[in-house]
Regions:
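Generic, ordered loop/turn and secondary-structure boundary motif
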Residues: 9-10, 17, 31, 61-65, ...
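Conserved Nudix-box catalytic region and its N-terminal flanking loop in Nudix hydrolases
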Residues: 23-35, 44-88
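Acidic, metal-coordinating catalytic segment for phosphate/diphosphate chemistry
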Residues: 1-44
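Unchanged
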Residues: 70-161
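Short loop segments at secondary-structure junctions
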Residues: 12, 40-44, 55, 125-129, ...
Length: 161
């Protein structure tokens, strides 16, 4: 099976060509990864977010992650990123329902893994009950809903669980 090719960019997001994901992470080449935060309101009106627990065979296994994310293959745009939501969570989404928030520049390095990503980041308001999600066990071990305030407090180290 041929390795997946992804588009490679310069630091200003000008397209340069393609490379494999492995090469991009080995050499620190800029590429794109679609991000989507799925949000809703609790019955009491509190803002909430859907978070996933990454699959055991994924990078950063069994850790909490955003609602849905994934690399964009060569030639794909953020519009094509909705495929990740269906592949991971079994949720079919109309791209028109997404709200573009921003494009983040993500830089991370650990040992021989160098990640330089542009992350077009979207918001989706969706109240699908958790039992209706069809999780792909290759990518996702579980999902849960958390109050946004609790997640922010965790990020700010105000709570540890």
């Amino acid at each position: 099976m041929a390795e997946e090719l992804i588009d490679i960019y310069d630091e200003k997001m000008n397209l340069l060509g393609t490379a494999t994901r492995e090469q991009a992470h080995r050499e620190g080449l800029w590429h794109t990864s679609f991000h989507c935060w799925i949000v809703r309101r609790s019955p009491e009106g509190r803002p909430q977010v859907l978070l996933q627990i990454r699959g055991k065979t994924q990078n950063h296994p069994s850790l909490i992650d955003i609602s849905s994310a994934g690399h964009l293959a060569a030639g794909e745009t953020a519009h094509d990123g909705i495929k990740n939501i269906e592949q991971e969570l079994g949720l079919k989404v109309d791209f028109g329902k997404l709200v573009k928030l921003f494009t983040a520049n993500h830089v991370f390095q650990k040992n021989n893994y160098i990640n330089h990503e542009f992350n077009p980041t979207y918001l989706l308001e969706d109240s699908t009950p958790l039992p209706e999600y069809k999780l792909n066990p290759d990518w996702v071990d579980g999902v849960f809903i958390a109050d946004v305030e609790d997640v922010l407090n965790l990020f700010k180290h105000k709570v540890d669980k």
